[in-house]
């Protein structure tokens, strides 16, 4: 959903668009709630309130003030991520395909021959980080840039087994044009760029679990963040390999040597970060042309000092000369060294060239060892070739993708590697490594152990759900870790599957009820975005690869109506009820009937079940941005702080009724996941509320009326407004509550319209207009520790006779209250009050 705020209506009609005019009779929160439950994707919000826009954005719903037709057209035709704190719109708009254009935010790609393999007549455009270079295209009242690129296609091609780039590109563009937008993946970079600066500013020690190549630039500015990944491929792992020969397989039609070098250096930087937690100087030997340095400098400020007889245009200091052993003393501490020296073959005989390459490999290693043998805080990444060679058993081997699989690979060495045991590795084993292993991640840090880290802030985005982790260990970590942002795969299956497949692995699935948390928020991706200054125009698909975002130790926990709130809670219900259901009242009718309340007169006004909890359960796949457990818990302890809106405090029994309705709904729909979720939420309600039932009551509250429009043969026809189980010394507490509620009780608009047999030999009249007051009374008694109400549904009625009678229907008739009293069952009246 996107909300576009306009001062004036527009003449043009847009598909999937609805207009909402600000209702001045309601406050900003109520307007935000009403907007969020509209069913179209685009909302044109007229006569808007800035406060309402802010509320929507904090809820994760993109809401933007629009001041021109161009702005409206740009925003209504695509999806976007909105940085509402800095008023920046990041479009995810691929309409540039109509210019016969693909886009990249990586400069090095523009220096390759990729143009020869594009679709006929197409071009490649460099748009900068997150499309920053496109800002000049939009002369808007807000900062706007198009973050959409085709880098995902290019990178997927590089790692694929396909060689024909044009066919690959064509297929992927057609897929993009015929499938829903993977909005979470597209906006994730924007999210990470907001998330980590805010966390690092607050927390001294931050752990990040499971980063992938998509984050390779994000963390360059954060050397103190400790990364955990899948570990490195080290020399001693080669013992499992059988010897092979030179393969000579082409991987990419266009030259990706630049990409390989960038990945090698970035891998080395992050390896250095995990050892020394600071930024190094980067030395490079055999550097030309290294156009990718430009890419790194767009993200983070590094000093690159390079040696090569050819130009390296983007290095900080360039020595246009060869590097020799005698120059090693020029390399200072707190640095990384990238050695990429190899003579081009040219027209040289391959045997002669092979000898030169092997000698250069030995020389490269000697430079690496000498560099590491003196000084401190150093890491080296060195180019090697497949040959009989001794290497430290702990050396880290790299084989990032390059244009052709030939004989080259790389090793990362640190100061400890050079003093460890070396192992002789035959040439054939190195060929086996080169032919079969591709380094898929620039993060080669060790795996994360699922243990609490009390002084650290843990971030684990899409990293822990894999089934090679113990499910219970994941739960324990989340329950015990005081400060963290951790995601787990949500169970949005219909058969309550404990795990689901993802690519070539399996993920555990989770529901919010799997966790025992306090001071934590459990929400969706868009709900989490709202907590970090972002909002989004499109929620993830309800049955997609979605995750729960669990934020432990947040200062936003008690801001119940601002973050992870109830906005959008009824949206799916509205979509169903106003389109395909038997009546728009279907939800109200079902909730009452499933709790054996058959008086459906005014059911949409006077419903006996919490619609919030019911919708949050049966449509949780759509609205799990709403943190239901937090909402229940804060109500249970009486710490619901709200800024505005039409606030109604539910009685705990209303929540129980909602769970019962949701369970029956789940059974009818054969939705085993909702069935379990509703059962567990009901248990949670009973856990956090101290609910007691007057199933064996000794007192009741009665209401006597001036007159009853039916014949009766009971002594005093009355409405029982609830039964109690109390000791005699608690009578005073009950009377005190009744006196406090006196005005509200006598203001009830009570009416009746028919009679019926409640049970065999019990003939009663229906009563409408008391439920909302009954639940308020229930809450007051609950807060005063008075046992009020039974476990079965409260169905207001007036007993007329204890014999069988025929049903009578009359026009709805108001009943005027004569008195309200407290009476002991089979005893005397102990309190009576009149208006």
UniProtKB/Swiss-Prot annotation:
Sequence segments annotated as region (2'-O-methyltransferase activity): 246-428
GO molecular function, one term: hydrolase activity
GO biological process, any: symbiont-mediated suppression of host innate immune response
Catalytic site positions: 718 (for 2'-5'-phosphodiesterase activity), 720 (for 2'-5'-phosphodiesterase activity), 797 (for 2'-5'-phosphodiesterase activity), 799 (for 2'-5'-phosphodiesterase activity)
Sequence segments annotated as region (N7-methyltransferase activity): 171-245, 429-555
Keywords of the record: GTP-binding, Host-virus interaction, Hydrolase, Inhibition of host innate immune response by virus, Methyltransferase, mRNA capping, mRNA processing, Multifunctional enzyme, Nucleotide-binding, Nucleotidyltransferase, RNA-binding, S-adenosyl-L-methionine, Transferase, Viral immunoevasion, Virion
GO cellular component: viral nucleocapsid
Localization of this protein: Virion
Function: Multifunctional enzyme involved in mRNA capping. Catalyzes the formation of the 5' cap structure on the viral plus-strand transcripts. Specifically binds to GTP and displays guanylyltransferase and methyltransferase activities. Has affinity for ssRNA but not for dsRNA. Capping activity is non-specific and caps RNAs that initiate with either a G or an A residue. Together with VP1 polymerase, forms a VP1-VP3 complex positioned near the channels situated at each of the five-fold vertices of the core. Counteracts the host innate immune response thanks to its phosphodiesterase that degrades the 5'-triphosphorylated, 2'-5' linked adenylate oligomers produced by the host cell IFN-inducible 2',5'-oligoadenylate synthetase (OAS). The host RNaseL is therefore not activated.
Family statement drawn from the similarity comment of this UniProt entry: Belongs to the rotavirus VP3 family.
HAMAP family: Rota_VP3, Rota_VP3_A
Annotated protein name in UniProt: Protein VP3
Organism of provenance: Rotavirus A (strain RVA/Human/Japan/YO/1977/G3P1A[8])
């Amino acid at each position: 959903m996107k909300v576009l705020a306009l001062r004036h209506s527009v003449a043009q009609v847009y598909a999937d668009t609805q207009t909402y005019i600000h209702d001045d009779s309601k406050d900003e929160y109520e307007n935000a709630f009403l907007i969020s439950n509209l069913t179209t994707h685009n909302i044109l919000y007229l006569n808007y309130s800035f406060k309402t826009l802010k509320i929507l954005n904090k809820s994760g719903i993109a809401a933007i003030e629009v001041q021109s037709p161009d702005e409206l057209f740009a925003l209504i035709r695509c999806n976007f991520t909105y940085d509402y704190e800095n008023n920046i719109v990041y479009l995810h708009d691929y309409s540039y395909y109509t210019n016969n254009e693909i886009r990249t935010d990586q400069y090095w790609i523009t220096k390759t021959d990729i143009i020869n393999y594009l679709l006929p007549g197409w071009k490649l455009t460099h748009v900068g980080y997150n499309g920053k270079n496109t800002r000049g295209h939009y002369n808007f009242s807000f900062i706007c840039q198009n973050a959409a690129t085709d880098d995902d296609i290019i990178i997927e091609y590089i790692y694929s087994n396909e060689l024909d780039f044009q066919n690959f590109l064509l297929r992927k563009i057609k897929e993009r044009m015929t499938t829903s937008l993977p909005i979470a993946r597209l906006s994730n970079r924007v999210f990470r760029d907001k998330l980590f600066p805010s966390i690092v500013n607050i927390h001294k020690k931050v752990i990040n679990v499971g980063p992938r190549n998509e984050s390779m630039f994000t963390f360059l500015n954060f050397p103190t963040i400790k990364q955990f990944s899948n570990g490195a491929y080290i020399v001693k792992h080669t013992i499992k390999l059988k010897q092979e020969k030179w393969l000579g397989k082409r991987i990419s039609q266009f030259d990706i040597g630049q990409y390989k070098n960038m990945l090698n250096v970035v891998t080395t930087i992050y390896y250095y970060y995990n050892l020394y937690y600071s930024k190094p100087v980067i030395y490079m030997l055999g550097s030309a042309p290294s156009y990718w340095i430009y890419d790194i400098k767009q993200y983070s400020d590094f000093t690159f000092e390079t040696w090569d007889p050819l130009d390296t245009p983007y290095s900080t200091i360039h020595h246009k000369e060869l590097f020799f052993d005698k120059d090693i003393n020029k390399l200072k501490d707190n640095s990384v060294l990238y050695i990429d020296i190899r003579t081009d073959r040219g027209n040289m005989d391959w045997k002669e060239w092979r000898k030169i390459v092997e000698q250069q490999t030995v020389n490269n290693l000697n430079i690496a060892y000498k560099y590491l043998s003196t000084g401190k805080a150093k890491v080296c990444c060195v180019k090697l070739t497949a040959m009989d060679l001794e290497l430290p058993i702990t050396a880290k081997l790299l084989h990032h993708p390059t244009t052709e699989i030939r004989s080259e690979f790389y090793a990362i060495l640190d100061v400890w590697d050079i003093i460890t045991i070396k192992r002789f590795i035959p040439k054939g084993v190195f060929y086996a490594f080169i032919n079969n292993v591709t380094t898929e991640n620039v993060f080669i840090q060790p795996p994360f152990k699922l243990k609490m880290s009390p002084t650290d802030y843990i971030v684990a985005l899409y990293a822990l759900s894999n089934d090679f982790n113990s499910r219970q260990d994941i739960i324990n970590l989340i329950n015990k870790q005081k400060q963290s942002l951790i995601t787990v795969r949500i169970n949005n299956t219909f058969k309550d599957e404990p795990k689901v497949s993802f690519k070539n692995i399996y993920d555990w699935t989770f529901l919010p009820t799997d966790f025992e948390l306090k001071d934590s928020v459990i929400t969706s991706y868009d709900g989490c975005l709202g907590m970090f200054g972002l909002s989004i125009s499109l929620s993830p698909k309800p049955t997609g690869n979605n995750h729960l975002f669990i934020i432990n130790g947040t200062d936003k926990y008690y801001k119940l109506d601002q973050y992870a709130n109830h906005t959008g809670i009824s949206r799916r219900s509205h979509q169903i009820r106003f389109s395909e259901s038997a009546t728009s009242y279907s939800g109200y009718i079902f909730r009452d009937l499933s709790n054996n309340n058959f008086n459906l007169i005014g059911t949409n006004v006077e419903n006996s079940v919490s619609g919030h909890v019911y919708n949050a359960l049966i449509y949780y796949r759509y609205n799990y941005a709403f943190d239901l457990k937090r909402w229940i818990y804060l109500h249970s302890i009486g710490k619901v702080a709200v800024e505005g809106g039409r606030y109604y405090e539910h009685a705990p029994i209303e929540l129980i009724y909602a769970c019962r309705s949701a369970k029956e709904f789940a059974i009818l729909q054969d939705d085993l996941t909702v069935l379990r979720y509703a059962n567990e939420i009901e248990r949670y309600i009973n856990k956090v509320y101290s609910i007691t039932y007057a199933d064996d009551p000794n007192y009741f509250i009665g209401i006597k009326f001036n007159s009853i429009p039916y014949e009766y043969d009971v002594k005093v026809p009355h409405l029982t407004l609830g039964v109690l189980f109390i000791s005699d010394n608690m009578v005073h507490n009950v009377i005190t509550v009744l006196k406090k509620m006196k005005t509200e009780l006598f203001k009830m608009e009570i009416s009746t319209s028919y009679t019926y047999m409640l049970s065999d030999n019990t003939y009663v009249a229906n009563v409408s207009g008391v439920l909302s007051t009954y639940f308020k009374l229930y809450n007051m008694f609950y807060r005063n520790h008075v046992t009020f109400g039974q476990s079965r549904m409260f169905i207001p009625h007036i007993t007329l006779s204890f014999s069988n009678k025929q049903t009578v229907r009359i026009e709805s008739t108001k009943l005027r209250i004569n008195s309200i009293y407290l009476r002991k069952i089979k005893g005397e009246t102990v309190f009576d009050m009149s208006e």
